Regions:
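Glycine/small-residue-rich interface belts in oligomeric ring/scaffold proteins
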Residues: 26-95
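Extracellular structured ligand-interaction cores
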Residues: 12, 67-69, 117-121
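Short, Lys/Arg-enriched N-terminal segments with co-localized hydrophobic residues
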Residues: 1-5
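Membrane-targeting and insertion segments and their boundary/processing signals
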Residues: 15-22, 42, 103-108
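A short linear-motif detector with a strong N-terminal bias
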Residues: 15-16, 49-53, 99-104
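N-terminal, Lys/Arg- and Ser/Thr-rich interaction peptides
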Residues: 6-29
């Protein structure tokens, strides 16, 4: 963890999300488990909630989501991988009835997508003392941290530093040192007021895994 800078800007917390596999579900349904091309806000909030020891349904997760803004930069986008799972046996439907013909086995093919060998830089800013609370939780997490799914373990500590050297999230995305040297152009995703496109990755109080919408823009990182 690097030291805090001396400039008088709002503190920004930086994460490095790196591992053999990551999966940030955005439109997962039943036997199809997709991954977004970058970490979702709900996924990042879930990672922080694990560090804080907040269980699913805890109202403080919703408060956490509302208190922070994030931006994500793809320093190494990774390769998309699809893992196929076959389940054979007596399979029950949601209402407890046997799927298929009585006494006969059924087969379900499921699809799970992952990003291989990706590296993402996440910048987080927030209200009050929320950044310091997140930093302390990530320094000594209550529960294990994972990259979207519990099977996706980070290959290094995710916390980089808290810095006040950057004027904004956009400034941080453009100037923060890249996690990996590359001649290829890199992009970042940042929240937008009106332009851009919609992502459904805002934590809500609705029952089940229902998410709200936010607008984001995809921009090329300038670098230094």
């Amino acid at each position: 963890e690097r030291s805090i800078g001396m400039e008088n800007h709002q503190p920004i917390l930086f994460l490095r999300l790196e591992g053999p596999l990551q999966s940030w579900g955005e439109r997962a349904r039943w036997n199809h488990r997709d991954t977004a091309y970058m970490p979702t806000k709900s996924g990042v909030i879930g990672l922080i909630a694990c560090a804080m020891g907040l269980g699913r349904g805890d109202g403080r997760i919703l408060e956490l989501d509302r208190a922070v803004r994030i931006a994500v930069r793809a320093d190494r986008p990774g390769l998309l991988m699809t893992d196929y799972h076959t389940v054979i046996g007596i399979i029950r439907t949601a209402d407890g009835k046997q799927r298929g013909r009585k006494g006969q086995e059924s087969t379900i093919l499921s699809y799970r997508q992952y990003l291989q060998d990706a590296i993402f830089l996440v910048a987080i800013t927030g209200e009050g003392n929320i950044i310091e609370r997140i930093r302390k939780a990530l320094m000594d997490p209550v529960w294990p941290i994972y990259l979207g799914r519990k099977s996706c373990v980070p290959s290094r500590p995710v916390l980089l530093e808290v810095s006040n050297e950057y004027a904004s999230l956009e400034d941080a995305m453009n100037r923060y040192p890249r996690c990996e040297r590359s001649e290829e152009s890199i992009v970042y995703e940042i929240e937008a007021e009106q332009n851009g496109y919609v992502r459904r990755d805002i934590v809500t109080a609705a029952p089940g895994r229902l998410y709200g919408e936010r607008r984001v823009e995809l921009k090329p990182a300038k670098g230094e």
